[in-house]
């Protein structure tokens, strides 16, 4: 099987003429370097992956999560090249998949989902806010590696970062909920954001997909289903091969490695594991889990670090080696869209069990939700203050961007960009400076 990819996929929006002597790196090696050295990537070290009330420093940050996802991504690619060698030409290089996994979370705001909901609510009349859309915006526009095009990454890298290839105006619910009487009474589940690309970044999205045929462009933005309610968002069906690998790496890191955090920090008990995951994993239909689920539980909760690591590694390996490349169920012409990496059905079910367990017993528990709620309030307070008197309160560079914006929505987007880039600690400190009665 031969796959010819047009050189357009290695192009950058801005045709750079960098002063670089004897630079023999591939476009994707250069992309990886830009991401790794960016301020947006560094900030991930101070954005927590799972918010709890523990004082321990064992837990993962968004940065360590991204590093683990990158390691998993290169592992997936390596085993696919051996397992299905006919796709060797089409599969991403290590530098490309590394780039996608390292960058996939850089648009996430402080305080995780709480911060995302807060910014989406404050931006409800100005195009919304969503973490993946913000990632695309950072790499294509905001990160100051270039003057106008962010990191100026290659086109294939940008396509791989787009998990939801449609504009938010296409995926957003027909109606929005009524605004809360007071921000303290805001219900987070009512304001979870629609997934997609900001409408204000349409020109950059159009540039990324320009090499595709009209048929492929049309198919790419198709939705999975028609929502049952006018208040329900739509969701896109398709993504590129590279993106499908990155997403699997992200999901495995979330479902398995975040589980490890929860066990070490005492957030889940063995009984909860038995009731919430072990029995379903034993019945998922995969022989590996049926055979090993008992010993996995013993090792995870043995209290011995090496045994827990062995169990985690075993689950990761079982999932990773169950991934294969399959044809997408629509007639895409471009091979980057015609094929996706997928878990075998039984293992997909097992990963869903793990992700649901982490969500139910780790993310949705009160001690985590209290921190997210507090963060949600902090972000809304800051947004309200900055948008009330931006020329007085914004830093000089951000104020200049605000002044140069030509519409109200553009001005609000500048404020959202500024707040979403903050670390958890930066947001907390600014909130104290704005609202605490203690003189700082």
Swiss-Prot record:
One of its GO terms (biological process) is dGTP catabolic process. It comes from the Bacteria. The keyword Hydrolase applies. SMART domains: HDc. This is Deoxyguanosinetriphosphate triphosphohydrolase-like protein. SUPFAM superfamilies: HD-domain/PDEase-like. Belongs to the dGTPase family. Type 2 subfamily. Residues 62-255 form the HD domain. Keywords: Hydrolase. GO terms for molecular function: dGTPase activity. The keyword Hydrolase applies. Signal peptide: none annotated.
